[in-house]
Amino acid sequence: MEDKNKTIKETLQGAADAGKRKKLIIKKKGDENSAPSSASPKKETIAESAPVKPLTPLPSRGDSGQSPIVRPAPSASKEVKYEESSRKQDSGQSGSRPLRDKDSQVRPSGDSSYPVSRSPFQKEDSNIIVSRPTQRPVRPNPGGSYQGNRGPGQGGGYQGNRGPGQGGGYQGNRGPGQQTGPGNRFGGSGPGNRSGGPGGRPMPITSAEVELSQARGSTGASKKKGHDKEKTSSDKRDFSGAENTKFFKQRFKKTKVVGVSGVSVPKEITVLENVQVGELAKKMNLKPGDVIGKLMKMGMMVTINNIIDAETAALLADEYGCKVKVVSLYEETIIEEEKDNEGDYINRPPVVTIMGHVDHGKTKLLDTIRRSSVIDTESGGITQHIGAYQVKTARGLITFLDTPGHEAFTSMRARGAKVTDIVILVVAADDGVMPQTLEAISHAKAAEVPIIVAINKIDLPTANPDKIMQELANHGLQSEEWGGQTMYVKISARENIGIDKLLEVILLQAEVMDLKANPKRKAKGTIIEAKLDPGRGSVATVLIQNGTLRVGDPFVAGVFSGRVRAMYNDLGQLIEEAGPAFPAQVTGIDGVPDAGAPFDAMADEKEARNISQHRIEFEKIGNAGAAAGTTSKVTLENMNEYIKLGALKELKVIIKADVRGSAEAIKESLEKLSTPEVKLNVIQSGAGAIVDMDVMLASASNALIIGFHVRANPKTIALAEKEQVQIKYYNIIYQVVDEIKLAMEGLLEPEKIEEVIGTAEIREIFKVSKIGNIAGCMVTSGKIQKSANVRVISDGVTKFDGKLKSLKRVKDDVNDVVSGFECGIQVDGYNDFKVGDTIEAYNVTVIKRKLE
């Protein structure tokens, strides 16, 4: 035993070169499992020098996991185990901090692992040291490695703490000799191409490593028993690329023809002339992004809210095997009219609109007629909204509309003129004709309704009715007393003078007009005003123009729908029904409709909602695709289309100039351009800037606005765009006349001049299957051109008039055949040729007509 100890001591002393003293505890192999006692003390030997690197104990197959683990000395004949006690190094190595040793102990069977034993560097501290050393200690016979603490003979590795004899690896903490796991090699070398130590004993993967490998999704090395698979960095890149390829194939796989709900694209869809991208995607059961992508490939940069035409939608749908049926959005918004039985018509009360200049007494007149005060409800003398009232007289009912007289409410007055039957024009006898008076006249004339003039305030000393009659006669309102057709009534609303006569004149005018309606049909009317009431919700004043409205009826009001929950008369009393010419307040609307919007009762609430939805879509899209002459206004550019449709018999113009004289000169020049086909009518002319009331008058009468040395402000321009009214600006009078003249010349039917260029006689008929009959002809005069029109004449009677389909000379197609040559002629749409008939070729020249 002493010889063995001597051999070990000499070996250790030969390796000492730093002069450091370490304390080694030398044990025999047979004593490693024996417990220490006072009877058998340990034998200790102090070495004069030791390796710089503290030696890590190896686990022994036969120990219990708590006793020190020994390693045989290189030159000893028998195995001995040694252990180095933890001591501080000299000042030259004081900056080095040792790493925690995490060697795992594994049972010989390999079925499970022992708990990690305490590191000898911890002393009695329970905290595990996790920081790496700032300076790597020198190791005897080290294997190649990077940032790893390994024992003698250890293989290369990267950031892994392994026991002696372990193969190289990559970021793995494994027991001695372990070879499995990503990058673990048998006795291999790590980065740096350093030689590794001998391979350790094959060890199974611990349960912790298996869980870590599964969590990372790594395939690791080969899991076959006894087989090691080497994996290089190239292999890892290939693996990562394969995973990415698989991911992108799943993420961006080819789009199937299925929608967001899993429903396949329908074989046919119905769209409007213009459709939103999002709505098209919804109809085709596709994601909006797919539709947008297809449109971008077609060169269209769109978003989900952009609108495309039906042709583009059809091209896109065709790629998915879907057919598109185009329907008119405008037609979807129209409610079919009921057919009335003539026996159901009855006389209805007249609807009267009171117009006039502010403070001329129109509200006082209505108050006197109704015998109830409404003046207290006004603010600043201006009526806040259009009121509708019905009054009883000795001869019948009369419905009154009170339109505001101030310029700010001109648009509402225009709507009032559209629903009225008779206009009462109130003019103060002591004031005369004012600008608002002329505006009221223009609106009434545009609505083509009769005007009854009420000269008010005749009780005042300064009243001059004759002056008023003269001024109005200059504007086309000549009284019956002076040989005209306008009825005048002199009244005093404050003194109740002439009121009964005025009512009598109104009813007399209504009898002349023979106003009738059918109370047995569904109600149809117009929204006079609408508001949001905090207690009742949306409330609309409706003037029923035909039919009868009852509580519970579903309806459509503008773009909104609803069901009548309750109805009130003009006195605020609940009513069950409202007949023709009756104003009623209606609740139960799902929105606040605009004044002037149409009101229609429906048989079914579902149908009402559908029409409401179509009108909302139409409002979003605008007038695109709507029928010409129904929604868009007349412009100088589209007048020709209107005249072709027969929708324009008269071109209406509003003239505004800087001075009155210029306006009159332009008016006289334009009125001379009228023709029997199209009449030019200047409905209003005056001096001053173009204002909102001019735009609303143009909208109500479908007219153009001509500005001479005047402009419209931005607010008025925005209103004109909303109402689709065209405003044209000029600085020279003849420019106005010339442009209007050119526009009207475009309305004139062009003159067509026909010129016969050749005739041919049919001498033989050739019947060709699948083609038809071909006439063998001899050109007798002029020439026959393939592009010419032809007519077939038999016995002086024209049998057919059309176009040539083919022209042949022998077997060749030719463009023309001159006199004296034979040819074969096929006429498009005609086969009933007879020998002896004449084919006449002619051209038509279109000459544009001009105004004289």
UniProtKB/Swiss-Prot annotation:
It is found in: Cytoplasm. Residues 492-494 are annotated as: G5. Keywords: Cytoplasm, GTP-binding, Initiation factor, Nucleotide-binding, Protein biosynthesis. PROSITE patterns: G_TR_2 (PS51722), IF2 (PS01176). GTP binds at residues 356-363, 402-406, 456-459. Residues 381-385 are annotated as: G2. Residues 347-516 form the tr-type G domain. Residues 106-120 have a biased composition (Polar residues). Residues 150-200 have a biased composition (Gly residues). It comes from the Bacteria. Residues 78-90, 227-240 have a biased composition (Basic and acidic residues). The keyword Cytoplasm applies. Residues 356-363 are annotated as: G1. Residues 456-459 are annotated as: G4. Its main location: cytoplasm. One of the essential components for the initiation of protein synthesis. Protects formylmethionyl-tRNA from spontaneous hydrolysis and promotes its binding to the 30S ribosomal subunits. Also involved in the hydrolysis of GTP during the formation of the 70S ribosomal complex. PANTHER family: TR-TYPE G DOMAIN-CONTAINING PROTEIN, TRANSLATION INITIATION FACTOR IF-2-RELATED. HAMAP family: IF_2_B. This is Translation initiation factor IF-2.
